[in-house]
């Protein structure tokens, strides 16, 4: 009798103690963060992206996600905007879309 009780308590404790996956940290605040970028690349210290990040005093190591260049906001309301390049959801937008960081590709089926 005691063995069954202890086994049940031990299994219940184990089930509660098992870690779960954390919620995703990169969530899109659509439609506010949806953008159409002419170029989307991994952050690097070299080339145009490295130069722009350096001018903004942003360390490549601090960036999670991709970097978008020449991005324009996409409005889901009204249907006037369409994206012929890469649709992304970006966390930060600098200089009116010249460079956006923390971008995640989005697939929009119309």
From Swiss-Prot:
Protein task: Aerial growth, conidiation, and dispersal of filamentous fungi in the environment rely upon a capability of their secreting small amphipathic proteins called hydrophobins (HPBs) with low sequence identity. Class I can self-assemble into an outermost layer of rodlet bundles on aerial cell surfaces, conferring cellular hydrophobicity that supports fungal growth, development and dispersal; whereas Class II form highly ordered films at water-air interfaces through intermolecular interactions but contribute nothing to the rodlet structure.
Location of the protein in the cell: Secreted; Secreted, Cell wall
Keywords: Cell wall, Disulfide bond, Glycoprotein, Secreted, Signal
Entry annotated with the keyword Secreted: yes
Signal peptide range: 1-17
Subunit structure and binding partners: Self-assembles to form functional amyloid fibrils called rodlets. Self-assembly into fibrillar rodlets occurs spontaneously at hydrophobic:hydrophilic interfaces and the rodlets further associate laterally to form amphipathic monolayers.
Entry GO CC: extracellular region; fungal-type cell wall
PROSITE patterns for the chain: HYDROPHOBIN
Protein name: Class I hydrophobin 2
């Amino acid at each position: 009798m005691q063995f069954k009780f202890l086994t049940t308590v031990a299994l219940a404790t184990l089930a509660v103690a098992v870690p779960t996956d954390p919620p995703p940290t990169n969530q899109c605040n659509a439609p506010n963060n949806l953008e159409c970028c002419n170029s989307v690349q991994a952050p690097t210290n070299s080339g145009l992206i490295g130069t722009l990040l350096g001018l903004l005093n942003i360390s490549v190591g601090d960036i999670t996600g991709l970097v978008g260049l020449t991005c324009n906001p996409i409005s889901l309301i009204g249907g006037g905007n369409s994206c012929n390049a890469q649709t992304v959801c970006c966390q930060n937008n600098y200089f009116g879309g010249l460079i956006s960081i923390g971008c995640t590709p989005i697939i929009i089926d119309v």
